[in-house]
Amino acid sequence: MGLTSLQVCMDSDWLQESESSGGSMLDSSTNSPSAADILAACSTRPQASAVAVAAAALMDGGRRLRPPHDHPQKCPRCESTHTKFCYYNNYSLSQPRYFCKTCRRYWTKGGTLRNIPVGGGCRKNKKPSSSNSSSSTSSGKKPSNIVTANTSDLMALAHSHQNYQHSPLGFSHFGGMMGSYSTPEHGNVGFLESKYGGLLSQSPRPIDFLDSKFDLMGVNNDNLVMVNHGSNGDHHHHHNHHMGLNHGVGLNNNNNNGGFNGISTGGNGNGGGLMDISTCQRLMLSNYDHHHYNHQEDHQRVATIMDVKPNPKLLSLDWQQDQCYSNGGGSGGAGKSDGGGYGNGGYINGLGSSWNGLMNGYGTSTKTNSLV
């Protein structure tokens, strides 16, 4: 038992003795000893049994079958029909990778295709940016053009307003009705600037028509309007008479001379009436001359009034020129204007014998207005 297993195996004497003693065993088995025989021989010696098992494993190593090889994996990039234009997300660090000899790339299982064209996204992003920049530049230029246009329009408007104040309007139907007029006293005054104040006062000033209403017609001295203001006295002693609409009441109280000898509503007046409102609508005072009283000659006031007839095609109004009616209570109720207001000695139509006809503006006239 003191011998080792290696010494036992290499001892030639032990092998010879075993052959001589077991000659019949060797003769019967011409083949090499099997593993079972070796194990049986070494069973008596436990140390030699381990060596015998290792030797048997070396001898039988060529006969053992190898594990079957894995089936070749198909590269998903090569099998895909979209690989020419699309990327393939086929690489994952958590999965074992495979090398494809065809595309010469490593790939792993679990990859998916991404439907993104190669280089397509960059091209699409550049075009909208250029269009946006162009639109922003164009939009930045537009406000400047608008500002210049607005300033030019304002300058043109101011220039036209200056010319309009000192030049008559070019309306052929109205003639000089809306244009500027010039008198020695008033100078050149625009119609829109002075409105009726420039026509009726010595010192014209801008008057708002809506604010002043009826008070703007004849509130200054030496103003001759359609209605004679009530004043106790005659023209022989009074040099300045306030003529105008007396708050809508055209009363003639003891006044011997009026602007127009139209309708007289009472009192001892020798004239001084009211014009028809419809006539006022058709009549505009264009040129107006003021004449003072002359104590040495005739002591009468002369008013020059220009009659302007609108175009019948434009307004379709009936013009009454040679008719006159008088209802004046007194001795001088003639319908003729003192001093010949018209150039041809015409008459002013003073219609309406009652206050209703006066306020309505049409009175008892047989002709009606076509616009109403």
Swiss-Prot record:
Q: Does the keyword Zinc apply?
A: yes
Q: Does the keyword Transmembrane apply?
A: no
GO BP terms: namely:
phloem or xylem histogenesis; positive regulation of DNA-templated transcription; procambium histogenesis; regulation of DNA-templated transcription; root radial pattern formation
Source domain of life is: Eukaryota
Task: Give the region (Disordered) as residue ranges.
Answer: 117-146
Molecular-function annotations in GO: DNA-binding transcription factor activity; transcription cis-regulatory region binding; zinc ion binding
Where is Zn(2+) bound in this sequence? 75, 78, 100, 103
Q: Subcellular location, in the record's words?
A: Nucleus
Fetch the InterPro entries from UniProt. Dof, Znf_Dof
Which Pfam family, any one, appears in the UniProt record?
Zn_ribbon_Dof
Q: Name one GO cellular component term.
A: nucleus
Q: Where is the composition biased (Low complexity)?
A: 128-145
Q: Where are the zinc fingers (Dof-type)?
A: 73-127
**What residue ranges are annotated as transmembrane?**
none
**Keywords recorded for this protein, A-Z:** Activator, DNA-binding, Metal-binding, Nucleus, Transcription, Transcription regulation, Zinc, Zinc-finger
Could you tell me in which tissues this protein is expressed? The PEAR proteins (e.g. DOF2.4, DOF5.1, DOF3.2, DOF1.1, DOF5.6 and DOF5.3) form a short-range concentration gradient that peaks at protophloem sieve elements (PSE). Preferentially expressed in the vasculature of all organs, including seedlings, roots, stems, buds, leaves, flowers and siliques, and particularly in the cambium, phloem and interfascicular parenchyma cells of inflorescence stems.
Q: What happens when the gene is disrupted?
A: Disruption of interfascicular cambium formation and development in inflorescence stems.
Per its database record, what is this protein's job?
Answer: Transcription factor that binds specifically to a 5'-AA[AG]G-3' consensus core sequence. Promotes expression. The PEAR proteins (e.g. DOF2.4, DOF5.1, DOF3.2, DOF1.1, DOF5.6 and DOF5.3) activate gene expression that promotes radial growth of protophloem sieve elements. Involved in the regulation of interfascicular cambium formation and vascular tissue development, particularly at a very early stage during inflorescence stem development; promotes both cambium activity and phloem specification, but prevents xylem specification.
Protein name (Swiss-Prot/TrEMBL): Dof zinc finger protein DOF5.6
| Native source organism of the sequence | Arabidopsis thaliana (Mouse-ear cress)
